[in-house]
Design a protein with these regions (language model features):
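Glycosyltransferase specificity loop/lid
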Residues: 1-451
Length: 451
């Protein structure tokens, strides 16, 4: 979202970026935007105490608390700004923001930060409920979803489709979002046409205006070509760049990079299975394991995720072939010549960063659209392997050996080809470049109509 905001500023649009107090305090480079005279930050309370971890498994608590705490402040910002707001670009999950925009008469564009294929899975839920197919039993997860040409099984739908109760608050939130999305004047996606053309065509049945402007991290660099570099990072975690020195000493394409993103949380058993699999694979590995990424039975200063007893074989295997850091400069790591694959949680940003870097993937999804993304990586785009619903050291080791060894050339060739299309899309004349120009003109038209 922050990269999209910077691109809008570059195009001469006046931007107010609204964030939570908690996230804004942790942005490392927010002062960078002072170079844009028409860019400003506003912050909202999220209603949670400072010590709340705000991890992906607690997203419903965050959304509910934020709606209650921030809606009045948001309404005030939207209705009383000077100059007045003439367009709201909102993340799709904040349906209450869309309601406020409608109340004050501000045109709405949705920017869904999940993948279009993931959003399409989300939008299928009301129909599955209406047809009586939802909820699913565990025995039915391998049944093919109708209308997907055999690509999607029920287990490949967004994670909330595993919930057994139609009245669960998460299911009701998804239904509410699905009902709100067609009310927007357009949908903005962080993707490119060559990657998801069939899905984007389907989206036109929901919204008359579709803007595929990604991959945003590469698109922003294209727009800034010849100018100052973009914001160093929009991550809320401090990057440990010592891993780059370690990578510099490794052979070409010999390292698999491992990260489960900024929100996912694994159990200690899962930690050990992944770790054993990496060591047993015989491959070199760089693992970015952020603080708080491992759940503990009794959280507290005396029981944190660093309190992990490391067996001798893991310690020796890591010392010989591995490097562990708290958080890595991911774009730089994926672009490094020593890296030859990515074991990822399949978050959409990470997936796109891997696509642009031409890195094959091993997908171990956790939440939301990640189940869909991992299926598309293996079954549709042929860019790697899908490890969903499995966390076994033998499977991990086998998949690492495939991606880094026996099928290395196959995956690398396909990934390199897709990377070329991604980069073409964000350069002048490319599909994403043209879609963004169209977005700017449409936003300016909204401004004219609102006067």
């Amino acid at each position: 979202m922050l990269k999209l905001a910077e691109m809008l500023s570059l195009a001469g649009i006046r931007v107010t970026f609204i964030n939570s107090h908690h996230v804004h305090r942790r942005l490392p480079d927010s002062a960078y935007f002072s170079k844009y005279p028409n860019f400003r930050f506003e912050t909202l309370p999220d209603g949670l105490p400072d010590d709340n971890p705000r991890t992906g498994d607690q997203i419903l608590d965050l959304l509910q608390a934020m709606e209650a705490a921030s809606q009045p402040v948001f309404r005030e910002i939207l209705s009383s700004g000077s100059p007045a707001a003439t367009c709201l670009i909102a993340e799709g999950v904040f349906v209450w923001a869309a309601s406020v925009a409608a109340d004050v008469g501000v045109p709405l564009l949705y920017f869904d930060t999940i993948s279009p294929c993931g959003l399409w899975g989300l939008l299928s839920l009301p129909n599955l409920i209406q047809s009586g197919e939802f909820p699913f039993t565990d025995e039915e997860l391998d049944e093919v979803v109708a209308g997907t040409d055999g690509v999607m099984r029920r287990r490949d739908l967004p994670s909330f489709c595993r919930i057994k109760d139609v009245n669960d608050p998460i299911i009701q939130l998804v239904i509410e979002e699905a009902n709100h999305i067609p009310l927007a004047q357009g949908l903005i996606f962080n993707t490119f046409h060559h990657l998801e053309a069939p899905i984007l065509s389907q989206m036109l049945t929901i919204s008359p205006n579709i803007y595929a402007v990604g991959p945003l991290h590469a698109h922003l660099k294209s727009r800034l070509a010849g100018g100052e570099p973009s914001i160093a990072s929009d991550s809320i975690w401090e990057e440990d760049k010592s891993c780059i020195s370690w990578l510099d000493k490794q052979p070409s394409k010999s390292v698999i990079y491992v990260s489960i993103g900024s929100l996912a949380v694994m159990t200690r058993d899962q930690l050990y299975e992944i770790w054993h699999g990496l060591v047993d694979s015989g491959s070199r590995f760089l693992w970015a394991r952020r603080p708080g990424s491992v759940s503990v039975p009794r959280p507290g200063p005396e029981h944190d995720d660093d309190d992990v007893v490391v067996p001798l074989d893991l310690s020796q295997g890591t010392k010989a072939r591995g490097c562990l850091v708290g958080w890595a400069p991911q774009e730089e790591v994926l672009a490094h010549p020593s890296v030859g694959g990515f074991l990822t949680h399949s978050g959409w940003n990470s997936t796109l960063e891997s696509v642009v870097a031409g890195q094959p993937m091993i997908c171990w999804p956790f939440h939301a659209d990640q189940q869909v993304n991992s299926r598309y990586v293996e079954e549709v785009w042929r860019l790697g392997l899908d490890m969903k619903d499995s966390c076994d050291r033998v499977v991990v080791a086998e998949m690492v050996r495939e991606v880094m060894g026996s099928r290395k050339d196959e995956f690398s060739e396909r990934a390199s080809e897709m990377a070329k299309f991604a980069k073409m899309s964000v350069n002048p004349g490319g599909s994403s470049f043209l879609d963004f120009d169209r977005l700017i003109e449409d936003i300016k038209t909204m401004k004219i109509l609102s006067i």
